[in-house]
From Swiss-Prot:
Gene3D superfamilies: 30s Ribosomal Protein S19, Chain A. Pfam families: Ribosomal_S19 (PF00203). GO terms for molecular function: rRNA binding; structural constituent of ribosome. The keyword Ribonucleoprotein applies. GO terms for biological process: ribosomal small subunit assembly; translation. Keywords: Ribonucleoprotein, Ribosomal protein, RNA-binding, rRNA-binding. GO terms for cellular component: cytoplasm; small ribosomal subunit. This is Small ribosomal subunit protein uS19. The keyword RNA-binding applies. The gene is rpsS. It comes from the Bacteria. InterPro entries: Ribosomal_uS19, Ribosomal_uS19_bac-type, Ribosomal_uS19_SF. Protein S19 forms a complex with S13 that binds strongly to the 16S ribosomal RNA.
Length: 94
């Protein structure tokens, strides 16, 4: 079920504070480390660089596309590593 239309988009207060501080200081190239994967990317985040925590490492996310606005930070920071499918053992044996 989607979020109610009357509610504003969720963005953690600490993320908003860090974004506003970066915009006020003019430090656009500085990476902002965040843990809140559920926060929505807002229009004022455009042009900033983030490091989103996936449970082990910080994954760099650069918000430089208009299409990223409205998505969540967690969508761009995968938490699982794909190990690949096992090949056919008969084909390897030949």
């Amino acid at each position: 079920m989607s979020r109610s239309a009357w509610k504003p988009p969720f963005c953690h207060p600490s993320v908003l504070r860090l974004v506003n501080r970066a915009l006020k200081q003019g430090s656009i190239n500085k990476v902002i480390k965040i843990h809140s994967r559920a926060s929505v990317i807002l229009p004022n985040c455009l042009g900033l660089k983030f490091a989103v925590y996936n449970g082990k490492d910080y994954i760099p996310v650069s918000v430089n596309d208009q299409n990223m606005i409205g998505h969540k930070f967690g969508e761009f920071s995968p938490t699982r590593k794909f190990a690949g499918h096992n090949g056919d053992k008969k084909a390897v044996r030949r």
